[in-house]
Regions:
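Structural signature of eukaryotic scaffold interfaces centered on beta-propeller domains
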Residues: 1-4, 47-55, 97-103, 145-159, ...
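Hydrophobic beta-strand positions that form the internal "hydrophobic ladder"
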Residues: 8, 59, 106-107, 161, ...
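Beta-strand-rich domains and repeat architectures in extracellular enzymes and scaffolds
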Residues: 1-18, 219-227
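Asp-box/WD-like beta-propeller blade repeats and closely related beta-sheet repeat scaffolds
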Residues: 65-68, 72-106, 110, 137-138
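Short, conserved, GDST-rich strand-edge loop motifs in beta-rich repeat architectures
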Residues: 222-239, 285-288
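Blade-loop segments of beta-propeller domains
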Residues: 28-60, 64, 86-89, 140-141, ...
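Conserved blade-ending motifs and adjacent loop-strand segments that build the rim/top face
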Residues: 39-42, 188-199, 248-269
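Beta-propeller blade signature
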Residues: 120-122, 235-250, 289-292
Length: 294
């Protein structure tokens, strides 16, 4: 999800069209666009860049399956006009990152490939560096990587990167150069992945901890779970998610308890809201939000 001017844009993964556009305040549907395909105006597996302020009806996504950045004119797309999407090559070094942030010529991102916690890629110099996994995490063996899956968020104003782990109840804070500043464990007991024979796979009884992380200038927001991974594929009514808020010293601030199970959310700082996606008991996928000022 992202916001652009008075709109909220949501990526649909299940079918065409690829993007749904809502009124940012009342969440009435305004339109949709984007078809699956290999053409310059098509999409296969797009993501929004993290931390971007999209204004003037212009936004960008990167498509990991098409290895391209797509510049989108939102108004042209909604009115089905030509030349609404322009494709630009995505640097091959960063293809496959589920979280991607830009700071000038530098990209920060992560990949679930066991190479490191996150990477720093300077396009101008061509230098690509992996930031090693912290020593408090289990060392990935052979080609296995899922055990150290994580999601990151980057603050350009603070010049810091936060990493939240899928299977560990740990959060790590780094500076722009990849130096570890601080780490915290959230919860009284240590949580880590349950591994199968010869540490070759994460077992379904492993607890999910943090499935998403967002941030603004003041706070870090973690989508927190406490459910076995095997149950997460078929959420039930009693399963609830939480959004845990930390400051940039990784000190605890508060927790928002959601009435649903969700794995994706957006902090709309302009409206002081948290918007999230959840599947209802009827099997529909709906948008929900709550006011952070209440």
């Amino acid at each position: 999800m992202c916001v652009c001017d008075s709109f909220l844009i949501v990526i649909g993964r299940d079918d065409e069209p690829c993007f749904y556009v809502y009124d940012r305040n009342g969440y009435q549907i305004k339109g949709s666009f984007g078809m699956n395909g290999n053409g310059p105006s098509d999409f296969l597996f797009p993501f929004f860049f993290g931390g971007e302020d999209y204004v003037g009806g212009k936004l960008e996504v990167y498509d990991v399956n098409l290895a391209s950045i797509k510049e989108i004119d939102l108004h042209r797309c909604l009115h089905k006009q030509e030349n609404a999407v322009v494709a630009i090559s995505l640097p091959k070094e960063i293809i496959g990152s589920p979280d991607l942030f830009r700071a000038g010529s530098v990209y920060y991102g992560n990949m679930d490939n066991g190479m490191g916690l996150f990477f720093r890629f300077d396009v101008s110099s061509g230098q690509f560096d992996w930031i090693d996994f912290p020593s408090s995490l289990l060392e990935p063996e052979r080609d296995f990587s899922v055990m150290n899956m994580n999601r990151i968020s980057y603050s350009e104003s603070r010049k810091e990167i936060v990493s939240a782990m899928f299977y560990y109840n740990r959060v790590f804070l780094y500076d722009e150069q990849g130096n570890l500043q601080k780490s915290v464990r959230l919860g009284e007991k240590e949580v880590c992945p349950v591994l199968g024979n010869e540490n070759s796979s994460v077992m379904g009884e492993s607890l999910l901890c943090f499935t998403d992380v967002q941030s603004d200038e003041n706070y870090i927001y973690l989508m927190a779970q406490s459910v076995e991974e095997e149950r997460s594929f078929s959420p039930t009514a009693e399963m609830k998610s939480r959004i845990v808020v930390l400051d940039w010293n990784l000190d605890y601030v508060k927790t928002y308890s959601l009435p649903h199970y969700s794995q994706a959310f957006l902090v709309d700082a302009g409206l002081h809201r948290i918007v999230y996606i959840a599947r209802t008991s009827e099997g529909n996928t709906d948008l929900f939000y709550f006011d952070m000022t209440e």
